From Swiss-Prot:
InterPro entries: HJURP_C, MEF2-like_N, TF_MADSbox, TF_MADSbox_sf. Residues 3-57 form the MADS-box domain. The modification Phosphothreonine is found at residues 304, 311, 407. This is Myocyte-specific enhancer factor 2A. It comes from the Eukaryota. Residues 58-86 bind DNA. Transmembrane segments: none annotated. Gene3D superfamilies: Transcription factor, MADS-box. Residues 382-394 have a biased composition (Polar residues).
Length: 495
């Protein structure tokens, strides 16, 4: 709507009249200036206010303009107030446009029809783009290919990047400009944006489990802040590490690694992925076959990290997240419908699922639990936890016996997964180990929360590393309180 038109009569209020005079006087001089410049003319403006105070404006020199005026004897146009009022009345009666916009706008049937058409087009557009109203359209596919041992596809990002685990259930193919967006038919949403964040107890920035959704976006966005805490409002769907040497773990085979220097955070939409963890199973899952990676210690970018499947619903004696309530059982749900949406990885260099009969009965054989790989810097007891009540068998090729060595992804083999072979030898350490010297390879970055680690192994460079994928859970409360559950030791390395 235009400006409100006032009635052209004398203003009775003295203050209001003074304000109006000041504004309109300047407006009149501004119009005179514009006219003089646009049309190359000379203008002299003389104003006396109600108290006989003089205000004047001249485009050039007032005396020259007044001299011209007094010497001018030709017939010319001369207007007074009555002439202007008469001209304005004629314009309004003829239906011509007034210099000022009208105060009220009348809707004619033609304009109402236009508005209806615009509204219909807008509704149709919103209906067609309901899937992703704020994002580019997604190409959904039910197969996920995550090369977890390929050196060219996976690489360490710059310090400050956060770790994101690959291969979420029923996820879609990753495009370079889009994040993992699940098909809405088989996925559920379980968001607790106000859930408290739990920092690691080692004093340095370790792995942290943010709220309840699991998401794998690519590209830099809102992520962990530098003090080891995750902003639950900015990135409520992030599973990542806030340490200085975290590992960007999610790469499609054809898209480049995420840009370094920024966290792999959320873009603008949260995909509705969740993993539900049933709390009942107490047994321990068997350790799995390990894989040997033949590449030098200095140049190996990333290999399969250790996966420990524990339940956060177990009593948290001796664990880092001692404040984690048992209500987290319902926050991560991995149902059979979600699991059956994924196919197993079968090509070499990929994770392939063992078709265990227990999983086949529950239609869980197709879901790679590598979707919850928790690599990077995990503190004590902070391994990402899943309880499926079934034995899980994941095999990788070539097969080699498990060895208690650091994997190239910065983890050591979880010795608590093999209690029948090696009892935990070390006493509990109440304080975290001091940082080792700089310049070590990523292999020496972290010792896992439950492995016995000999310092002499650190000085033994090897060209091959085995990368165990261990799926298991501490069998009883003694293992949870045993010396094997200790604080992790953190080293920095130069990438």
């Amino acid at each position: 709507m235009g400006r409100k038109k006032i009635q052209i009569t004398r203003i009775m209020d003295e203050r209001n009249r003074q304000v109006t005079f000041t504004k309109r006087k300047f407006g009149l001089m501004k119009k005179a200036y514009e006219l003089s410049v646009l049309c190359d003319c000379e203008i002299a403006l003389i104003i006396f206010n109600s108290s006989n105070k003089l205000f004047q404006y001249a485009s050039t020199d007032m005396d020259k303009v007044l001299l011209k005026y007094t010497e001018y004897n030709e017939p010319h146009e001369s207007r007074t107030n009555s002439d202007i009022v008469e001209a304005l009345n004629k314009k309004e009666h003829r239906g011509c446009d007034s210099p000022d916009p009208d105060t009220s706008y009348v809707l004619t049937p033609h304009t109402e029809e236009k508005y209806k058409k615009i509204n219909e087009e807008f509704d149709n557009m919103m209906r067609n783009h309901k899937i992703a109203p704020g994002l580019p359209p997604q190409n959904f596919s039910m197969s996920v290919t995550v090369p977890v041992t390929s050196p060219n596809a996976l690489s360490y990002t710059n310090p400050g990047s956060s770790l994101v685990s690959p291969s979420l259930a029923a996820s879609s193919t990753l495009a370079e400009s889009s994040m993992l967006s699940p098909p809405p038919a088989t996925l559920h949403r379980n968001v607790s944006p106000g859930a408290p964040q739990r920092p690691p107890s080692t004093g340095s920035a370790g792995g942290m489990l943010s709220t309840t959704d699991l998401t794998v976006p690519n590209g830099a966005g809102n992520g962990p802040v530098g003090n080891g805490f995750v902003d639950s409002r900015a990135s409520p769907n992030l599973i990542g590490n806030t340490g200085a040497n975290s590992v960007g773990k999610v790469m499609p085979t054809k898209s480049p690694p995420p840009p370094g220097g920024g966290s792999v955070g959320m873009n603008s939409r949260k995909p509705d992925l969740r993993v539900v963890i049933p709390p009942s199973s107490k047994g321990m899952m068997p350790p799995l076959n390990a894989q040997r990676i033949s590449s030098s210690q200095a140049t190996q970018p990333l290999a399969t990290p250790v996966v420990s499947v524990t339940t956060p619903s177990l009593p948290p004696q001796g664990l880092v997240y001692s404040a984690m309530p048992t209500a987290y059982n319902t926050d991560y749900s991995l149902t059979s419908a979600d699991l059956s949406a994924l196919q197993g990885f079968t090509s070499p260099g990929m994770l392939s699922l063992g078709q265990a009969s227990a999983w086949q009965q529950h239609h869980l054989g197709q879901a790679a639990l590598s979707s919850l790989v928790a690599g990077g810097q995990l503190s004590q007891g902070s391994n990402l936890s899943i309880n499926t009540n079934q034995n899980i068998n994941i095999k990788t090729e070539p097969i080699s016996p498990p060895r208690d060595r650091m994997t190239p992804s910065g983890f050591q083999q979880q010795q608590q997964q093999q209690p029948q072979q090696q009892p935990p030898p070390q006493p509990p350490q109440p304080q975290p180990q001091p940082r080792q010297e700089m310049g070590r390879s990523p292999v020496d970055s972290l010792s896992s929360s439950s492995s016995s680690y000999d310092g002499s192994d650190r000085e033994d460079p090897r060209g091959d590393f085995h990368s165990p994928i261990v799926l298991g859970r501490p069998p009883n409360a003694e293992d949870r309180e045993s010396p094997s559950v200790k604080r992790m030791r953190m080293d920095t390395w130069v990438t």
